Amino acid sequence: MSSYKYYDLIRKPIITEKTTTLSEQNKYAFYVDKFAEKLTIKKAIEEIFKVKVKKVNILNVKGKKKRFKGIIGTQINRKKAIVTLEKDHNIDFAGGIK
C-alpha cells in the first residue's frame, strides 16, 4: 500500500490531557478511518512516523446526541486507535513549538 493511502487512514492525533499522560507510557491515540483494521493501522503508523509499533487497540466511539435550536441531531461515529510503541521509540507532536 502506498504512503498516500496511509495518510487517508490516519485521520488525526488525539491530543488531550488524558492522552498526554498516556504518552508517558509510550501510548498514542489517533482517530482512524472507520473501516481500518489493526494490521493496517500498525503499518500506517510505522510508515508515517518511522517508529516501531508494539500493539494496537481499537475502540468504536458512538456519536453523542446534540441539540441545536430545538433540533436534535447526532455527532458522527468514530473509530479510535491507541497505539503502543516499542521502548526506544516516541512520537513528538509538538516538535519545534517553544
From Swiss-Prot:
Keywords from the named record? Ribonucleoprotein, Ribosomal protein, RNA-binding, rRNA-binding
Does the record bear RNA-binding in its keywords?
yes
Question: Which domain of life does the protein's organism represent?
Answer: Bacteria
Q: Name one GO biological process term.
A: translation
Q: Which Pfam families match?
A: Ribosomal_L23
GO CC terms: ribonucleoprotein complex; ribosome
Q: Which Gene3D superfamilies match?
A: 3.30.70.330
The molecular function terms of the Gene Ontology recorded here are:
rRNA binding; structural constituent of ribosome
UniProt similarity note: Belongs to the universal ribosomal protein uL23 family.
Question: What is known about its subunit structure?
Answer: Part of the 50S ribosomal subunit. Contacts protein L29, and trigger factor when it is bound to the ribosome.
Q: Which HAMAP family match?
A: Ribosomal_uL23_B
Report the function annotation for this chain: One of the early assembly proteins it binds 23S rRNA. One of the proteins that surrounds the polypeptide exit tunnel on the outside of the ribosome. Forms the main docking site for trigger factor binding to the ribosome.
Q: What is this protein called?
A: Large ribosomal subunit protein uL23
